[in-house]
Regions:
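Flexible, D/E/H-enriched segments
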Residues: 1-38, 53-156, 167, 189-299
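Beta-strand elements within well-structured catalytic alpha/beta cores of enzymes
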Residues: 38-45, 139, 172-180
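Glycine-rich, aromatic-flanked loop segments that form ligand/cofactor-binding clefts
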Residues: 44-48, 112
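Short catalytic/ligand-binding loop motif for oxyanion handling, primarily in non-cytosolic enzymes
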Residues: 48-52, 183-187
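Generic secondary-structure microfeatures
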Residues: 143, 178-180, 186
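Phosphate-rich cofactor/ligand-interacting catalytic cores and adjacent structured alpha/beta frameworks
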Residues: 158-162
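Nuclease catalytic cores that cleave nucleic-acid phosphodiester bonds
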Residues: 165-171
C-alpha cells in the first residue's frame, strides 16, 4: 500500500511495473463516477497514526467534520483533507451502539495510507488543494494487534451499519469500501508469501457464499494468507452491509505488486438497478458497495 501511494504521488503510474496495477482500477473509477455516491464509508486499518500500541480500539468510527492526512514519517501525502459526514456518522454510532456494538467515537482523527490510497485508487489522483468527490466516514478496524475481531463479528457489524443507514432520515446514496490485504506477509521466514488460490476462492465466496467466510478462524487466514492476511476480515464488514444476493460488477486481481497480491471487487445490491428507476423516497436508501485490497502494509 505505501508503495502504491508513492507511485501515485511521484508520477510513476505509467511505468511498466506499475501500469498494469493502475489500469486495473480504471473501470472502478468509471463506476464511481457513474454511481455518484453521496457518502463513502471506508473500512480500513490504522498504522499507528490515529492510534498507537498504547490504545487500539477494536472498531473506531470517525465522526469529525474533516480528516487530514497523517504524517507517517515523511510528511503527509499530497492529497486533500477528507470531508466527513458528522450527521450520518453520529447516527451510525448511536444505532450501532444501541445494537450492542461498542464503537469508539473519534471526533478528531487523522487518516493514513490505509485509507487515502484506496480513495486514490477509486476516485483517481486529486491534488492537495482539490476536493474528494464525496464526504467519507472512516471505520478503523484493529487487525494490527492481537486479538483482532472475528470475521463473523465484522460481518454482523456490517449488518448493523446497513440498518443504521436505512434508518437515517435523509435519502443518501452510500457506498462502503472494504480494504485490506489479500494474501501477503511483509516480514519473517515467509516474507513475500502470495496464495493466489486462496485469494480467488475468497473473492468467489465474498460474492456467492459469505456465510462460509464468516466461519474462517484467524489461524486459517495467517496460515494460508500470511501474517497480514488477517486484514481480509475487513472486507466482511462491507459484505455484511449488502443484500444476501449481490451482483458482481467487476473483479481485478494481479500479482505481484511490491511483493504482494493486489485485487478488488465491485458488488452491487440487485435491488439497486430497479431502485434508481423509481422516484427517490425518504425511507429508501439506494445502496451500492465495493471492496478492494491493496496490500503491503507498513508497520
Amino acid at each position: 500500500m505505501p508503495a502504491i501511494g508513492a507511485a501515485i504521488d511521484n508520477g510513476k503510474t505509467e511505468e511498466p511495473y506499475w501500469k498494469r496495477v493502475f489500469v486495473g482500477f480504471e473501470k472502478s473509477q468509471q463506476w464511481m463516477r457513474e454511481t455518484k455516491p453521496d457518502v463513502a464509508i471506508v473500512v480500513y486499518n490504522d498504522h499507528a497514526s490515529a492510534f498507537s500500541v498504547e490504545m487500539i480500539p477494536t472498531f473506531a468510527l470517525g465522526c469529525a467534520a474533516e480528516f487530514p492526512p497523517a504524517d507517517e514519517g515523511w510528511g503527509p501525502r499530497p492529497v486533500p483533507v477528507a470531508e466527513g459526514h458528522p450527521a450520518l456518522a453520529s447516527h451510525i454510532a448511536q444505532s450501532c451502539i444501541l445494537d450492542e456494538f461498542d464503537l469508539t467515537i473519534c471526533n478528531k482523527m487523522e487518516i493514513d495510507h490505509g485509507m487515502t490510497v484506496p480513495m486514490n485508487l477509486l476516485f483517481g489522483k486529486i491534488e492537495k488543494h482539490g476536493h474528494w468527490p464525496c464526504p467519507v466516514i472512516p471505520l478503523a478496524v484493529n487487525v494490527v494487534m492481537y486479538p483482532p475481531p472475528t470475521g463473523h463479528r465484522c460481518y454482523m457489524l456490517g449488518r448493523a451499519i446497513r440498518k443504521a443507514v436505512e434508518s437515517f432520515p435523509d435519502d443518501l446514496h452510500v457506498v462502503i469500501f472494504g480494504t485490506g490485504g489479500l494474501s501477503h506477509q511483509i516480514s519473517g521466514p515467509r516474507a513475500g508469501l502470495i496464495n493466489s488460490k486462496w485469494d480467488k476462492n475468497f473473492l468467489d465466496n465474498l460474492t456467492k457464499d459469505p456465510q462460509k467466510l464468516v466461519k474462517v478462524p484467524h489461524i486459517d487466514y495467517m496460515r494460508e494468507a500470511g501474517a497480514e492476511g488477517i486484514e481480509m476480515v475487513m472486507w466482511l464488514v462491507m459484505r455484511g452491509a449488502l443484500d444476501d444476493k449481490v451482483d458482481e460488477v467487476y473483479r481485478f486481481y494481479t500479482v505481484p505488486a511490491s511483493n504482494t497480491a493486489v485485487g478488488h471487487i465491485i458488488l452491487e445490491n440487485r435491488a439497486r438497478k430497479s431502485a434508481v428507476k423509481r422516484k427517490p423516497a425518504t425511507k429508501h436508501k439506494r445502496a451500492a458497495a465495493r471492496a478492494r485490497s491493496a496490500v503491503r502494509r507498513s508497520r
